[in-house]
Amino acid sequence: MTSAVVDSGGTILELSSNGVENQEESEKVSEYPAVIVEPVPSARLEQGYAAQVLVYDDETYMMQDVAEEQEVETENVETVEASVHSSNAHCTDKTIEAAEALLHMESPTCLRDSRSPVEVFVPPCVSTPEFIHAAMRPDVITETVVEVSTEESEPMDTSPIPTSPDSHEPMKKKKVGRKPKTQQSPISNGSPELGIKKKPREGKGNTTYLWEFLLDLLQDKNTCPRYIKWTQREKGIFKLVDSKAVSKLWGKHKNKPDMNYETMGRALRYYYQRGILAKVEGQRLVYQFKDMPKNIVVIDDDKSETCNEDLAGTTDEKSLERVSLSAESLLKAASSVRSGKNSSPINCSRAEKGVARVVNITSPGHDASSRSPTTTASVSATAAPRTVRVAMQVPVVMTSLGQKISTVAVQSVNAGAPLITSTSPTTATSPKVVIQTIPTVMPASTENGDKITMQPAKIITIPATQLAQCQLQTKSNLTGSGSINIVGTPLAVRALTPVSIAHGTPVMRLSMPTQQASGQTPPRVISAVIKGPEVKSEAVAKKQEHDVKTLQLVEEKPADGNKTVTHVVVVSAPSAIALPVTMKTEGLVTCEK
């Protein structure tokens, strides 16, 4: 019998022989020798290895489906003993090679989805672009600031809460055979920043008692002070602001949907006898911790009520909060860019969304002095983009870098109405248009199927060196009909540029036609364009001549999981461009001064 001990690196080799090689060298056996791979008792094997070793009559050893055994390495350091029960002594070297091949094979779990067992496993982070993920739960959304971190934060461990000796007894007797619940409270979402993780008690499992659950709610910015709040934190006095909601959360945590405050109140009275809680006399729904716990997370009441003050303050990069989003808040956030004193810096350099964009089309043929000073979105082709820090009260979604923008065409509906009315011979030939893109509201869904509305907190646009140029031209196939074609190859969107919308800008919703025009490269055509608001006075007409108009283009793309891709087009319509189409206003941009 020959024994070979080889580590996973293949450097250590120990041989021992039982002295029967010379006696049985000339003898031939009909059975094939068996190669047995068994773990050494002292070694700790985390992955199982499997292979087939074939031994033919001519004493040639082969590994089935293994061509390059020596080139595949594993990261685990295990020791495996390969015992060969054979009568052929001269096959020892081949047996050791077979044992080494077994040690260098990939785990069956890694080879399950691959036909070739010798393919080197590439980690997902090598070929996958960088992603940012923000957990969303619509049931715990509050009005707070949004920040996203891509770093894995350490779990927050705190010292055990000092209680009386009787506090470790369970609140209720456990049922026989029922496992203790290991899930966290529903408001924590598994995030290390929301709630604190207690050190496990010896012999008590991971059961969360009611007083611990209330303490977690007091330390959660999603529930404090919305459902429960401190009245005197130094003395440990707190109040149940919404006792029904707290009892529902406790019932959801205990998997009891019929939980109410009356049932939970009986459990609270149990803590009176144990010396954990006390009822504050003369005040309803007010309780007090007998021994105030140490190292608790303090939630500021003003922090969750005023969002705008939060945006001006310095926040931690690893904090994650939920927000609610409405159409009015989106329009206010987009229009607050031009007033730098109202917007505070929030750096989201890795968040982008390419499927929903705002395209800004402006005609730089006019002089800069003739434009309104409020329309800072109108950027000429020679102007370099500036960095914009937008304080948008919206969550951040997951996306990748380097999104593309496609070709879009704006076509006038009336065939006889001219699209371009030239005011100068220079702009009549080929005026150029600058395109900018920013993300807009886009519907999405969570893991549990709840549909929510998300908004990226970064403005994306084209760099100054890669600005797409548009030609205001007349199609040859459409008689008397003008169109705006965004020509050129798709460009990657990576830079930042200031974008704002003027006061009183109408927001339009336009529908995409189901069938495109025939041709080799037919552009997408908007079925309608907008017209400036009705003129009330000469001063208003002069101001609105340079205002930025907004179009919203809805396009269905069922190829990507039936997602709706929304394009919002911001058009600057000076006197050089006439848009003679009636509009349907869905909302107006309001600017706070």
UniProtKB/Swiss-Prot annotation:
GO terms for cellular component: chromatin; cytosol; nuclear body; nucleoplasm; nucleus. Keywords: Activator, DNA-binding, Isopeptide bond, Methylation, Nucleus, Phosphoprotein, Transcription, Transcription regulation, Ubl conjugation. Belongs to the ETS family. It is found in: Nucleus. Residues 146-201 are annotated as: Disordered. One of its GO terms (molecular function) is sequence-specific double-stranded DNA binding. Residues 208-290 bind DNA. This is ETS-related transcription factor Elf-2. Residues 171-181 have a biased composition (Basic residues).
